[in-house]
């Protein structure tokens, strides 16, 4: 019996269910939207609000909410596998990473990450207040490259409930992005969750290395005194912003 998963919204889960094979097929056909039947259109509509360039769907597997991310036609490297490996590496390094899973169905890779902005209650899901770094800083998409990790640190100081813990976590995430060459570290890929009293850094998400040939690498956000230069030296030079000394 194939494992079935259910697309969902903010209310009770709808009755229509899909196997992982059907999801993988839908993700492939989503690149030719006119081929989709009505039920699969509803499924992909549930995933369209998640953002990003890759086909994805919001689902429930068992009683847990997940995001399923699929191969994209024309991928030059196995991005689903690379993201899984990178996130597992981040977890091994002590970063806050949600539960992960991986399936290969009909020769299509499916990367799965458990949602941390929903709380399951039987057949419906409670929304946890979530804000991206873009929202927390009151920024606009057109000006994201003018912001820095120091600005995110400022938001943690202003709105956070566990300031020191989250400052150190943010610094480690910046180092990870430098070391794995993740240059998609824009403000939407940093999140905050409301804990009832204030805001905490959300668990890590959307960290994917990008192959690069150049010797000089840059992140989207500013790193340290040398701006967006993706070097450990630049990060360490600005460590005081994160309440870290050079000895730390």
For every predicted segment, state its role:
Residues 1-187, 191-248:
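Phosphate/dinucleotide-binding and metal-coordinating scaffold of catalytic cores
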């Amino acid at each position: 019996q194939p494992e079935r998963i259910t697309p969902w919204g903010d209310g009770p889960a709808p009755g229509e269910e899909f196997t992982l094979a059907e999801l993988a097929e839908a993700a492939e056909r989503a690149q030719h939207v006119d081929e989709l039947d009505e039920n699969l259109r509803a499924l992909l509509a549930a995933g369209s609000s998640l953002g990003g360039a890759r086909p994805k769907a919001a689902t429930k597997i068992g009683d847990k909410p997940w995001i399923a991310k699929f191969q994209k036609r024309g991928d030059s490297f196995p991005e689903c596998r690379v993201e899984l490996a990178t996130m597992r590496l981040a977890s091994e390094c002590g970063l806050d990473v949600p539960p992960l899973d991986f399936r290969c169905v009909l020769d299509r890779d499916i990367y799965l990450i458990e949602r941390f902005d929903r709380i399951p209650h039987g057949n419906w899901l409670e929304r946890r207040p979530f804000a991206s770094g873009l929202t927390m800083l009151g920024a606009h998409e057109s000006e994201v490259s003018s912001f820095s990790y120091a600005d995110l640190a400022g938001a943690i100081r202003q709105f956070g409930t566990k300031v020191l813990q989250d400052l150190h976590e943010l610094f480690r995430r910046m180092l990870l992005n430098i070391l794995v060459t993740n240059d998609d570290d824009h403000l939407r890929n940093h999140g905050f969750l409301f804990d009832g009293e204030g805001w905490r850094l959300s668990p890590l998400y959307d960290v994917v290395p990008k192959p690069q040939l150049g010797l000089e690498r840059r992140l989207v956000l500013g790193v340290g005194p040398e701006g967006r230069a993706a070097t450990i030296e630049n990060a360490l030079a600005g460590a005081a912003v994160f309440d870290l000394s050079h000895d730390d």
